[in-house]
C-alpha cells in the first residue's frame, strides 16, 4: 500500500465513520489478542500471586517459574486458558474503544469550534481516550472478569465459560460479574487516555519518518509501554478484586481494603507483580492493535476506491 494511504486516522479532525471504526476496531482487537494470548495468561498469573513478608523463605515467583509450573501441571493448552471470553472481550473492546474515541474526538472538535476553545492536541487525545476507556469497560467488563477467573484456575481440567458464569451468578449474583469495576474503570480509563495521548505525541514526533514501514506499530509500542508503565498498580488491584470471592470465599467488598492488604502484606512492590511480562505483553498488543486499526481503514478505503463500479 502506498504511503499516501497511510494517514493518521486517530488524529484530531480525522474523518472516520462509525462503521469504519467499528469494523477496524473489532479486527484490531481480535488480531492483537490472538497473537499475545500466552503473555496475557502469564501476566495475570503473576498478578494473582500473593506473598507475605512474614514468610521470607517463600520461593520467589518469576515469570519463568510460572511458565514451568503451568506447563508441568496444566499442559501447553493452559497458556490459552480463558481465551474464548478473552477473544470476545478484545473484539468487543476494540470495537467500542475505537468507535467511541472517534465519536468523542469529533464531538470535542465541534465543541472547540462552537465555543472558540483552543485545546492542545495532547489534551484532546487524552480526554477522548478516557471516555473511550470508560465506555469500553462498561461494555465488556463481565468478559474481563470471566477471563481472569478462568486463567486463575490452576487445575488441569479447563473450566467452561458458561459453567463459570453460572457459578458466579449463583454464588454472588449479578453484582459478582462487576466485582472490582471501580478500580477497573479508573485503571482502564487512565490507561486508554494515556495510550491515545502518547500515541498521538509519538506520531507527531515521527512525522518525518511517516514512510517507514510499521511506523504506526512503533508509535503504538511506545504508547502501550508508556500508558501501562504509569497505571500498572491499578491493573493489579483490578485483578485481585476479580478473584477475591474465589480466594477468600466471601463476596468482594472494598477495593481500598484489598489495596491496603496488598501493600501491608507484600509491600508496594506487590502492586507491580508481573510488571515486566505486562510491558512485554501490553506494548506489542498496543503496537499490533493500533497498526491493525490504521491499516484496516486504509486498506478498506483503498479497496473501495480501486473497485470498479458496476
Curated annotation (Swiss-Prot):
GO molecular function, one term: thiamine pyrophosphate transmembrane transporter activity
Cross-referenced SUPFAM superfamilies: Mitochondrial carrier (SSF103506)
Superkingdom in the source lineage: Eukaryota
One record GO biological process: mitochondrial thiamine pyrophosphate transmembrane transport
Disulfide topology: none
Keyword Transport attached: yes
InterPro entries: Mit_carrier, Mitochondrial_sb/sol_carrier, Mt_carrier_dom_sf
Start-end of each Solcar repeat: 16-107, 120-205, 211-299
Subcellular locations according to the entry: Mitochondrion inner membrane
Keywords: Membrane, Mitochondrion, Mitochondrion inner membrane, Repeat, Transmembrane, Transmembrane helix, Transport
Membrane topology listed for this record: Multi-pass membrane protein
TM regions (residue ranges): 16-32, 88-104, 117-141, 173-197, 218-234, 274-291
Keyword Transit peptide carried by entry: no
GO terms under cellular component: mitochondrial inner membrane
Pfam family, one: Mito_carr
Record function comment: Mitochondrial transporter that mediates uptake of thiamine pyrophosphate (ThPP) into mitochondria.
Annotated family: Belongs to the mitochondrial carrier (TC 2.A.29) family.
The protein's name in its UniProt record: Mitochondrial thiamine pyrophosphate carrier 1
Organism: Lodderomyces elongisporus (strain ATCC 11503 / CBS 2605 / JCM 1781 / NBRC 1676 / NRRL YB-4239) (Yeast)
Gene name for this UniProt entry: TPC1
Amino acid at each position: 500500500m502506498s504511503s499516501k494511504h497511510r494517514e493518521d486516522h486517530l488524529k484530531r479532525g480525522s474523518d472516520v465513520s462509525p462503521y469504519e471504526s467499528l469494523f477496524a476496531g473489532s479486527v484490531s482487537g481480535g488480531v492483537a489478542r490472538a497473537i499475545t494470548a500466552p503473555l496475557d495468561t502469564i501476566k495475570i498469573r503473576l498478578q494473582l500471586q500473593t506473598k507475605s513478608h512474614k514468610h521470607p523463605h517463600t520461593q520467589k515467583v518469576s515469570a519463568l517459574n510460572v511458565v514451568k509450573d503451568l506447563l508441568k501441571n496444566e499442559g501447553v493448552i493452559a497458556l490459552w486458558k480463558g481465551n474464548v471470553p478473552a477473544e470476545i472481550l478484545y473484539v468487543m473492546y476494540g470495537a467500542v474503544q475505537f468507535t467511541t474515541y472517534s465519536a468523542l474526538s469529533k464531538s470535542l472538535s465541534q465543541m472547540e469550534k462552537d465555543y472558540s476553545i483552543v485545546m492542545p492536541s495532547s489534551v484532546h487525545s487524552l480526554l477522548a481516550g478516557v471516555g473511550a476507556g470508560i465506555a469500553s469497560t462498561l461494555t465488556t467488563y463481565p468478559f474481563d472478569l470471566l477471563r481472569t477467573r478462568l486463567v486463575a484456575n490452576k487445575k488441569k481440567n479447563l473450566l467452561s465459560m458458561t459453567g463459570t458464569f453460572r457459578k458466579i451468578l449463583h454464588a454472588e449474583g449479578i453484582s459478582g460479574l462487576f466485582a472490582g469495576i471501580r478500580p477497573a474503570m479508573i485503571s482502564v480509563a487512565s490507561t486508554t487516555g494515556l495510550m491515545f495521548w502518547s500515541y498521538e505525541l509519538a506520531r507527531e514526533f515521527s512525522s518525518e519518518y511517516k514512510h517507514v514501514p510499521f511506523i504506526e506499530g512503533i508509535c503504538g509500542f511506545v504508547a502501550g509501554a508508556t500508558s501501562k508503565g504509569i497505571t500498572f498498580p491499578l491493573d493489579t488491584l483490578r485483578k485481585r478484586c476479580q478473584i477475591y470471592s474465589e480466594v477468600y470465599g466471601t463476596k468482594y467488598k472494598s477495593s481500598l481494603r484489598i489495596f491496603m492488604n496488598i501493600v501491608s502484606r507484600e509491600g508496594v512492590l506487590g502492586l507491580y507483580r508481573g510488571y515486566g511480562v505486562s510491558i512485554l505483553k501490553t506494548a506489542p498488543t498496543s503496537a499490533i492493535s493500533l497498526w491493525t486499526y490504521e491499516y484496516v481503514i486504509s486498506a478498506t478505503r483503498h479497496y473501495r476506491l480501486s473497485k470498479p463500479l458496476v
